[in-house]
């Protein structure tokens, strides 16, 4: 371990294996907190490479509680958080809408670290059981089309890094690992990142982790597809990364100011999302969710973004997605 940390002190990059070894030690609670802080700081200042991120993610997945992985195509739709904009819970809402459009989604999330209301805060407010067993969660994906995996239940070892992270009060590699360590191991993923500098490296990381099809996005300051500006996309298809830019017009929607999709605390967000999923959402709110569902649908082979967007809007207006929220709340 000393050799690995010394390598970081010299601003040298670790191999995937070395990174996996380092994070394995962290997750098992075997690394001295001072050395852990030093390693996390050195990685941050140097800038984490796809090899280092993939190695860390593999270490966390190897130490996670097991999950009965489906053998069909299924996805996660998730943002790193930390974009500082406190928008409504777009990816969580999009998960239900995507399921109502016929996709399978196993969403991995946590309580909010930076925004007023993280995905689990919202689900909690709808009465959805966050401590659902792995078996019940799997049957929800099978039968309802959507389920939620609560990170602490599967990744108990992350607690060993918590005091160090809280004391450091700065972003570390852990801030980007969450979306990469879904214990269900989906083969399709739409991941939003808080900085456009992360788009390409995270796509390269996903390629190393064997994703079948995925897209990493940054939307003009947001960790999701934007309706207030351009969205930078790095999409993995057939083992190759394609980079392109999308505008609201590509989805057939109007441009809206960021203020139009501001969120609040869990109760306010619950009211907004309930309206959205029962046909009472504003045009901006409907568009914001629909463009994210549309890109996720593309990853399942539905290539027409405008048709996908319209289907997502129709599903929200029909109330079909809200029925899935209720079903998941009754599930277990």
From Swiss-Prot:
InterPro entries: Anthranilate_Pribosyl_Tfrase, Glycosyl_Trfase_fam3, Glycosyl_Trfase_fam3_N_dom, Glycosyl_Trfase_fam3_N_dom_sf, Nuc_phospho_transferase. Keywords: Amino-acid biosynthesis, Aromatic amino acid biosynthesis, Glycosyltransferase, Magnesium, Metal-binding, Transferase, Tryptophan biosynthesis. Anthranilate 2 binds at residue 165. Disulfide bonds: none annotated. Anthranilate 1 binds at residues 79, 110. NCBIfam families: trpD. GO terms for cellular component: cytosol. GO terms for biological process: L-tryptophan biosynthetic process. This is Anthranilate phosphoribosyltransferase. The keyword Transferase applies. Gene3D superfamilies: Nucleoside phosphorylase/phosphoribosyltransferase catalytic domain, Transferase, Pyrimidine Nucleoside Phosphorylase, Chain C. It catalyses: N-(5-phospho-beta-D-ribosyl)anthranilate + diphosphate = 5-phospho-alpha-D-ribose 1-diphosphate + anthranilate. Belongs to the anthranilate phosphoribosyltransferase family. One of its GO terms (molecular function) is anthranilate phosphoribosyltransferase activity. Pathway: Amino-acid biosynthesis; L-tryptophan biosynthesis; L-tryptophan from chorismate: step 2/5. Binds 2 magnesium ions per monomer. Mg(2+) 1 binds at residues 91, 224. Catalyzes the transfer of the phosphoribosyl group of 5-phosphorylribose-1-pyrophosphate (PRPP) to anthranilate to yield N-(5'-phosphoribosyl)-anthranilate (PRA). Mg(2+) 2 binds at residues 223-224. Its cofactor is Mg(2+). 5-phospho-alpha-D-ribose 1-diphosphate binds at residues 79, 82-83, 87, 89-92, 107-115, 119. It comes from Vibrio vulnificus (strain CMCP6). Signal peptide: none annotated. Its EC number is 2.4.2.18. Homodimer.
